[in-house]
């Protein structure tokens, strides 16, 4: 059987584009000339006219936030001269994990029993100590900031209770508390060790380490063409894998690897219950052996000035990335000058990574800049683990059960390994998923129009640079290959179905022509929800094909390498399209040569004519001559200027930009469900909940809480209400995952199946509003089903 899931957001795509265009046409502005002599104001989905990013230490940040010369401090903790000023507010997100790591060579801790006993002593001592700012004792790797926390909440609660228990009389002495045994890495880890456990050892047997979430996630992400995978990058089980798998020994690694491999390859036939059960098994397997043990997590608290008129509003943070996320740049606006003001951001450190959109932008400051300059196909949902449409809309068809699969059209294309040349898949190709995309293009900053070749070339790049056979030709980068592997493993074919063309009159005598490519992508074994599947390999690139080709040629010629690791191995510079003046000079000469030759790479021979290629290189040459760099994209902002401590970005006021004003505004102040009551009535569990909301009124905000009913609304927006419950048997196996029944009187009901075997069960229930799965209000209930079929 083939199931279809179609999802569109009213706030994206043609509807929002037309709303933005119509609004722009209605508000004729004095500035901003647009064709035929008409003056048309454009109001896109992002606000400030300029963004300035300055490096600032905590003292400077505190002063700047206080006097509104800085609007937002991203990624750091400011220091104020006294109490936090009343006009300065903050939002919290997941900052880091606190993890114990045992030295595998230590004779004290060769056995799992010794490690687990020592870890228990340390965790209990930490739990009984005082509170440290931002630290939460939580000895489980999936936290309340993870969208899948509901799937693990009983396990997390049990782990906390277990770690608080005193050890029995037979326990091994707490050798790990010896002053010569325990080390610390990171400021918070040092504080905890000193205050709870004594001095810090110089040559320790076990180390308490603070592991920032940014580093854990960025090392697994990919920038190519603004693919932002893997799609499961915000899941708690994936973070647990990244955090704990490196410490697994030979005895405990196979079970964890098997569970992880099944999760990321979609090898599941039992539906959501089987998947959730496997996620829980993976986390359990990662904790066995106590080679690495989670103590808890630290929150990241980021500050902004909200005073009127100089402050900002409409601030959204991501539960995992904080303010360093695409949604922040696309929502934040100045209170006094929403569209023509200058936004001042502070960051704690200068960028020290190379600026290239393949293996670069790895430090926090560079990532912040790239979230503004680039425009991904989809962006992370700020308060769950799924994705929001940005430059694509999608419809998913997926095989369910034991169907023979989805036939891939014979004329669909698939890159050849090694060369990346696009070949027909032939008559016998099949897939388990088909995603049909409508792509919302816009011109690149060098003036070239985004076309089909730009959408397809990232696939060719993936198969060329992901093939180790190309190592000898300098056309292989292990780091790049690793993050592109999920795409390469699953792609079954790509077919461009058509390019729709529509005309929109935005003013008298002014007409916009909108081209919308429709592309089918065929996949095999893609896991996750519909949007996660759609975000695996969308036909999209925020950089043009000719820039990707230029970077490839620079690497093949030995001028640079995409990633820091490969640059160090080959002893060449890390490819930087902006700040490496020597490389830029070489690239300028190469562009002139390619323009003269009308150069096209082999995968594009049938998609790009010689004249089109010549025009592309000509435009890129002119862009570099004018701007002094090669960072060409088609996102909301362009790079205007830079120094070692300052980056300035200009807004792109392009009338064909497809996303109109207010596209992401709904994610400001997400509502939250609060379960007020949960009771068992026979074979049903009934719950009642309230909706806690923050509503804007004039220049201020009002906190409100009201019963969650079918008529409850968030201002003018109806609430999207999603419920979920887990049913877990006495052995700990997840035997059911489903939504609750929402009755007309507002109560939620879980109806336990009549065929449910007698015994003890755990029910976990949660309710989410507008997709907000962070820090859920959940209930864990113990239910007994009697032998006669009625609850005992």
Protein language model regions, located:
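Surface-exposed binding/hinge segments that line
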Residues: 2, 300-308, 315, 472-611, ...
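Append "and occasionally in soluble cytosolic enzymes with long acidic Gly/Pro-rich linkers
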Residues: 110-195, 279-281, 285, 292, ...
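Extracellular/periplasmic solute-recognition and catalytic clefts
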Residues: 38-44, 48-102, 198-239, 642, ...
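Local pocket/hinge segments that shape ligand/substrate recognition
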Residues: 44-45, 74-174, 221-265, 286-310, ...
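Aromatic- and charge-enriched surface segment that lines or borders ligand/interaction sites
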Residues: 106-117, 408-474, 521, 686-688
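Bilobed periplasmic-binding protein-like "clamshell/Venus-flytrap" ligand-binding domains
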Residues: 128-131, 171-179, 254-261, 266-306, ...
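Long beta-strand-rich cores associated with HINT superfamily self-processing modules
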Residues: 300, 304-347, 362-365, 596, ...
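Gly/Pro-rich hinge or "lid" segments in bacterial periplasmic/extracellular proteins
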Residues: 31-45, 329-330, 351-352, 359-371, ...
